[in-house]
Structures are given as C-alpha cells and as structure tokens.
Amino acid sequence: MILKNLLNELKCLIIEKLDFLNLYSPVNNLYIKIQPYYPWNIKPFIRRIRFYSKFVKKGDLCFDIGAHYGSYTRFLLRIGTKVVCVEPQRECLKKINEIYGKNKKVIIIGKAVGEKEQFSELFISESSNYISTLSNKWREKSRFSNNFKWTKTQKVEVTTLDNLIQEYSLPKFCKIDVEGFEFEVLKGLTKIIPFLCFEFTRELFEDAKKCINYLKSLGDVLFNFVKGASTYFFYPNLYQMINYMKK
C-alpha cells in the first residue's frame, strides 16, 4: 500500500511537471499511440483486430459512439475502415482531435447521442475528466457510483443515430459505450445496422434486456456477448443466449 501511494505521488509529480512545461499533452498522446505495441500488449491488440475483422473489412464505415479517446477507433482504423467518432466530453474530444484530427479516415463529432435532438446535461467525474454520463440511473445505481463524485457538468448537444446515418450513410458496424445511456441511444435508431455492440453492466442487466427487445422490434436480429475486453463470444450458439436472457 505504501509503495502504491508513493508511485501515485510520483505519477502526479511527473504529470504536473510535464503540464507546467506544456509537454503533458504531446507525451500522453505519444503514449496512447505506442501503447498497443508494448510487448505485453501486442498479442491482445492483434486478437482484437482479428476479432473485429470478422465483422468489418477495409473501406467499411463504422460508428464509434462514446469514443472516449478513441481506443475502439484505433482498432477499426488498423483494419482499414472509416470511422465516425462521436464524443461530447470536452477533455476526451480534445484528446481525440489531437490524435486523429488529421486522419482523413476519421470524422470527429463533438456531440452526445440519444433518442432525440436536444441539449442535455452531461455529468463528469470529479476524480477523472474522462468518465462522464448522461444517465442519472448509472450515476446512482451502478457499481461505480461510490467511486466517483459528479460535481462537474457540461451542457452538450444531442443528436440521434438516425441523423448520423442520414448524414454519413448506414455503417457496417456501430459500437455504443455511453455509461448507462445505451437504451436512450438505441431509441434514436429506426434501421437495422448489420453489426452493433453496446456495453452493459451486470447490476443494470434489465437495461440490457430493454436494448435487446428494442433491437428485436426493428427486425430479425441475432445476439451474443463478450465479457469485458475479451475477443470471443460467451455463448457458442443463439439458443444458450436466449435461455440466459430468460433468467
């Protein structure tokens, strides 16, 4: 514990020094870019590229909804896709622009996504500017609710998946990771996207069922899930997944 605290203090001192010298942002961007190529990260990075290559190929269009600082975008770009990168949070948006702003295969949109066009209040974690949510339920009832204080807010413009599709065309793949706001995002979609993934947490599993039922209302769809950042489906066939959802 003492060693961990010392390392955290050292990390903070280094960040403060780099920030004072206006070096933190370029150094951090370099770290993000080379991180996948660290020896201990190469195999997981390759596995994820192989996994997503099952769904998309070079030239396909993808949506990264709730892009954070572009970790999914990075995998998709390595496959050769084009990515519409959507992120409302200022700090994350700044990071995405620094990393991908000059990439012609990336379109960066500084908006949130929801059921309808409007302006909403985005809650931002006091301890980490990179964690934010539009969901009151996620702030109050998720397993993360005791870990963060939500004293900061940001007014954000909200668009819909249908609007994005109308402007950029139907994507082959769409990833949605919006900290408990996934169902609201899906309610702004009236078309079936060939491949779509959304995040859910075990303590808010009923919300995941709502997402699945809504997608089923759009047409014939199949479901499975992966655990965490793994690169294999949890269930080998659809029927096991259906039985699990009925529990």
Located regions from the model:
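Phosphate/nucleotide-binding beta-alpha loop and adjacent structural elements of enzyme active sites
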Residues: 1-247
